[in-house]
């Protein structure tokens, strides 16, 4: 642990970012919180994004919840991913909020989803709920860009979901739509409504939606990387 400290400014290169992330591997969240002068919450019920915030502090992330990537100068997005003892993802991964209006002319190439997933630093974290939060360890990081096949898989799902949004079918979309990318309501409470297009082209109010990567996508991605690593 000697010399291990959070980055006070965004890293100047991918190599520096990855090196810092690799240094965190094996440490518990409690240890990293203490070194950063923070107290780990008992659980994540009221602090759902706490692990991400902790790692943003350690890695010198800049964006917060702004639309650009967490490491805007590098074009890299940070994604923490809770995994079980086998390294399998325990939940879907939030990508970004879905635009429900003003989508004429939008393409996969210029989409927010593709922008966010262009370059991702994945940091697996133990997610087994039987392990106290402070004792959960950080795993080995992975700096990833979608290959041609992954990009095509995501594009097909995105196009299907966006077609439904544009055609006024947002209320008919379920988590089962999309093979690897899904659209789900994203709101802290059911009163937070946003405008969308209805079946007759009229403006309706509905829950905000978010794009999420399904577990089958991230599981394959992590498994391939760590098999290669091994």
Swiss-Prot record:
Keywords of the record: Cytoplasm, DNA damage, DNA repair, Endonuclease, Hydrolase, Nuclease
Predominant localisation class: cytoplasm
GO biological process, one term: DNA modification
Source organism per UniProt: Citrobacter koseri (strain ATCC BAA-895 / CDC 4225-83 / SGSC4696)
Database matches in Gene3D superfamilies: DNA mismatch repair MutH/Restriction endonuclease, type II
Gene: mutH
CDD domains according to UniProt: MutH-like (cd00583)
GO MF terms, alphabetically ordered: DNA binding; endonuclease activity
Task of the protein: Sequence-specific endonuclease that cleaves unmethylated GATC sequences. It is involved in DNA mismatch repair.
Recorded superkingdom: Bacteria
Family annotation (InterPro entries): DNA_mismatch_repair_MutH, DNA_rep_MutH/RE_typeII_Sau3AI, DNA_rep_MutH/T2_RE_sf, Restrct_endonuc-II-like
Compartments (UniProt record): Cytoplasm
Family per record: Belongs to the MutH family.
Signal peptide coordinates: none
This protein's record includes keyword Hydrolase: yes
Protein name stated in the entry: DNA mismatch repair protein MutH
HAMAP family tied to this protein: MutH (MF_00759)
GO cellular component term, pick one: cytoplasm
């Amino acid at each position: 642990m000697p010399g291990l400290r959070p980055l006070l400014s965004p890293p100047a290169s991918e190599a520096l970012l990855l090196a810092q992330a690799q240094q965190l591997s094996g440490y518990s969240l409690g240890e990293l919180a203490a070194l950063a002068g923070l107290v780990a919450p008992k659980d994540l019920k009221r602090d759902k994004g706490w692990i991400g915030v902790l790692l943003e502090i350690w890695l010198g992330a800049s964006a917060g919840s702004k639309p650009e990537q967490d490491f805007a100068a590098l074009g890299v997005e940070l994604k923490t991913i809770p995994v079980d003892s086998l390294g399998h993802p325990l939940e879907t991964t939030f990508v970004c909020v879905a635009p429900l209006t003003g989508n004429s002319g939008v393409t996969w190439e210029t989409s927010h989803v593709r922008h966010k997933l262009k370059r991702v630093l994945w940091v697996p974290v133990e997610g087994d709920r039987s392990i106290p939060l402070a004792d959960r360890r950080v795993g080995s990081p992975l700096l990833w860009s979608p290959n041609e096949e992954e990009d095509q898989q995501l594009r097909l799902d995105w196009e299907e979901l966006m077609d439904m949004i544009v055609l006024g079918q947002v209320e008919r979309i379920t988590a089962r739509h999309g093979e690897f990318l899904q659209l789900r309501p994203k709101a802290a409470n059911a009163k937070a409504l946003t405008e969308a297009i209805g079946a007759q082209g009229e403006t309706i109010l509905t829950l905000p939606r978010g794009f999420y990567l399904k577990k089958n996508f991230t599981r394959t991605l992590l498994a391939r990387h760590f098999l290669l690593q091994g």
